[in-house]
């Protein structure tokens, strides 16, 4: 009995001659290696189908090429090799290749004062394209932080001043009395509203960069804002966090400008756009600001 040849329907001609901009797979579960640590990720992989007479692509070839991601540290060079393999396995069919990797980047972050540390998750998307020998990599990173409203802080200070006048009117001021008052509930009769906020960064990397500057970018963003969300804390850390918020009062406009100026100085960045969202505790809506640099709209 002769062995039957398995049919390859994708290699057949299409009944409708029409090229397609993108064909591939989305949501592929796989491990990737970042900073020499394996991480669970999801990948979208595809190519253009430029041969309009071809019925389809060979998705299994894309899938198998992704095995390279679990074998070595994720770098722009590795991404380019994978995309080139996409194209080599579809010679005559495709001229462009695309790969997106999504994961939560886990970084251990130190406390502000104490020796404690804890893990913080940063949603990350890495997008790579190869077309006509032109290679591009873009990063999308979410950076959480705390924002305290400058207007609310001014109003709170005014209420504290008024309370001070009421409590010390027509009284000689004694250092010990004022110090005790400042440490009492009357001394903090009002507090400004603050909220957890988020900076969504979309960055285009230089074409010939050797490494993905993930940690450096996150550090630059958090240093510019000054109020990074914390992990494990003691009371001394919480006090330092309160001080950081008081010294970095921010509208969403302030946060966007700080990030813009900081990211311009970050090495390896060719262009970026960003969006900051302050999930207002005063209002039922968000305060939002956007900014970009060297980015074609």
UniProtKB/Swiss-Prot annotation:
Residues marked May be catalytically important (site): 149
This protein's record includes keyword Nucleus: no
Entry keyword set: Hydrolase
Transmembrane segments: none
Protein name: GTP cyclohydrolase FolE2
Gene Ontology biological process terms from the UniProt entry: tetrahydrofolate biosynthetic process
This enzyme's EC code(s): 3.5.4.16
PANTHER family in alphabetical order: GTP CYCLOHYDROLASE MPTA
Reaction catalysis annotation: GTP + H2O = 7,8-dihydroneopterin 3'-triphosphate + formate + H(+)
GO molecular function: GTP cyclohydrolase I activity
Organism the protein comes from: Pseudomonas fluorescens (strain ATCC BAA-477 / NRRL B-23932 / Pf-5)
Pfam families, sorted: GCHY-1
InterPro entries for the chain: GTP_cyclohydrolase_FolE2, GTP_cyclohydrolase_FolE2/MptA
Function: Converts GTP to 7,8-dihydroneopterin triphosphate.
Family: Belongs to the GTP cyclohydrolase IV family.
Pathway in which this enzyme or protein is active: Cofactor biosynthesis; 7,8-dihydroneopterin triphosphate biosynthesis; 7,8-dihydroneopterin triphosphate from GTP: step 1/1
